[in-house]
């Protein structure tokens, strides 16, 4: 519940910090054989992420955004809503984890302007999420060199909370593009040989030293899940920062300008988004048996709907078949009801799955090819929807 500057000094007028331990901010190297595979889900309360790009505890998954898109609002919303999904043995179903004290958030902002810093501080304090958030703020007018140590201080804090205190920690780093620019600036000052677009040749290695500090360790209860946010200059996904980040991390969540221009919030485009570890975070015992099938069917139908929409622009609506019109109806409702979500509208994973079934019922059973008959029998009829 404290606020620090980019060097780790408190700036919230609170009492001085009494250190329990002094740790190297570069992190101690972890024996690869001691790492365990990320499992179980961190619930963000946002349908497009929870249902279609589920985040496992211990995963690293970046948000690819761009200037003028609401990535800060989405980050603040995740901080407000994020939590664990826990099994309730008695009912045989899952519920949101009641043990909130077992979940913590470390938020590091690098190179942000004063307005953004105030937005995060005010949002966390007003909505009661500050008590589980540790906030590090490196402002745009702070020294460049400080920007390079801010994420490392944040991750050292997260490692202590995860591996010494047994907490499941979500680390949000924004904006990694500012970090990469700081790295380029320092590299140029040291007169090192520049690489692609002036960034240093070791930027891949340097980014890996940050991203690879996510994960779980055998014999320790806690986990570190990372969500780095980066703004792509000129919406260019081939820019070195998003390009190298994509190689290191386990998927990406793509914030789309076209959806944003159509007033859809959060403007998450599910088609280029991907969570590589989703399969180990969902399913019976972790979320719900139908989760993977529903996600596959939503992806398939949304992709077909996009194709039909493009075809309609060429041949006109009169030339479309009745089946095509169903896909168009699904496309419209999917974006208006499933993707669109209020900034303070939290949906748990079961509400999101039920909403997905409501949309899939637009189609007759025969068109739902990705869902096994057994699952359809249980969930397709309206009465079966719990």
Swiss-Prot record:
The family database entries (InterPro entries) matched by this protein are listed as: ATP-synt_VA_C, ATPase_a/bsu_AS, ATPase_F1/V1/A1_a/bsu_nucl-bd, ATPase_V1-cplx_bsu, P-loop_NTPase, V-ATPase_su_B/beta
Q: Where, by residue number, does the polypeptide cross the bilayer?
A: none
Query: According to the lineage, what is the superkingdom?
Result: Eukaryota
Report whether Transport shows up as a keyword of the record: yes
Which residue positions does the secretion signal occupy? none
Q: Name one GO biological process term.
A: vacuolar acidification
Keywords, in A-Z order: Hydrogen ion transport, Ion transport, Transport
Query: Would you tell me the Gene Ontology cellular component terms?
Result: proton-transporting V-type ATPase, V1 domain
Record-linked PROSITE patterns: ATPASE_ALPHA_BETA
Sample GO molecular function, one term: proton-transporting ATPase activity, rotational mechanism
Q: Name one Pfam family in it.
A: ATP-synt_VA_C
Membership in a protein family = Belongs to the ATPase alpha/beta chains family.
Q: What does this protein do?
A: Non-catalytic subunit of the peripheral V1 complex of vacuolar ATPase. V-ATPase is responsible for acidifying a variety of intracellular compartments in eukaryotic cells.
Q: Which PANTHER family match?
A: V-TYPE PROTON ATPASE SUBUNIT B (PTHR43389), V-TYPE PROTON ATPASE SUBUNIT B1-RELATED (PTHR43389:SF27)
What does the subunit comment say?
A: V-ATPase is a heteromultimeric enzyme composed of a peripheral catalytic V1 complex (main components: subunits A, B, C, D, E, and F) attached to an integral membrane V0 proton pore complex (main component: the proteolipid protein).
Name-wise, this protein is V-type proton ATPase subunit B 2
């Amino acid at each position: 519940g404290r606020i620090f500057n980019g060097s780790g000094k408190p700036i919230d007028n609170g009492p001085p910090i009494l250190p329990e331990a002094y740790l190297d901010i570069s992190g101690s190297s972890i024996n690869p054989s001691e790492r365990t595979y990320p499992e179980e889900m961190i619930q963000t309360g946002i349908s497009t992420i929870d249902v279609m790009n589920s985040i496992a505890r211990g995963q690293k998954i970046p948000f690819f955004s761009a200037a003028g898109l609401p990535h800060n609002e989405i980050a603040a919303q995740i901080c407000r809503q994020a939590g664990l999904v826990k099994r309730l043995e008695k009912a045989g179903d899952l519920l949101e984890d009641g043990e909130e004290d077992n979940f913590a958030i470390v938020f590091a902002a690098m190179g942000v302007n004063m307005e953004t810093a105030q937005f995060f501080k005010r949002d966390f304090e007003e909505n009661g999420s500050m008590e589980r958030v540790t906030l590090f703020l490196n402002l745009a007018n702070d020294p460049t060199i400080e920007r390079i140590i801010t994420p490392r201080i944040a991750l050292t804090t997260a490692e202590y909370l995860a591996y010494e205190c047994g907490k499941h920690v979500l680390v949000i780093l924004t904006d990694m593009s500012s970090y990469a620019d700081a790295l380029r600036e320092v590299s140029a000052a040291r007169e090192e040989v520049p690489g692609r677009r002036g960034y240093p040749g070791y930027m891949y290695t340097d980014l890996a030293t940050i991203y690879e500090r996510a994960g779980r360790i055998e014999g320790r209860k806690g986990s570190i899940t990372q969500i780095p946010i980066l703004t792509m200059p000129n919406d260019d996904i081939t820019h070195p920062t998003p390009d190298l980040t994509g190689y290191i991390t386990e998927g990406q969540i793509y914030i789309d300008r076209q959806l944003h221009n159509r007033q859809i919030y959060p403007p998450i485009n599910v088609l280029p988004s991907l969570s590589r570890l989703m399969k180990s975070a969902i399913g019976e015992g972790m979320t719900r048996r139908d989760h993977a099938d529903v996600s596959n069917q939503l992806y398939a139908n949304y992709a077909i709907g996009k194709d039909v929409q493009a075809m309609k622009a060429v041949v006109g609506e009169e030339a479309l078949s009745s089946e095509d019109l169903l896909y168009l109806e699904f496309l419209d409702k999917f974006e208006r009801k499933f993707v669109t979500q209020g900034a303070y509208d939290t949906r748990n994973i079961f509400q999101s799955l039920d909403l997905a079934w409501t949309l899939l019922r637009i189609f007759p059973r025969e068109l739902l090819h990705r869902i096994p008959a057994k699952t359809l029998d249980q969930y397709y009829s309206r009465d079966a929807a719990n």
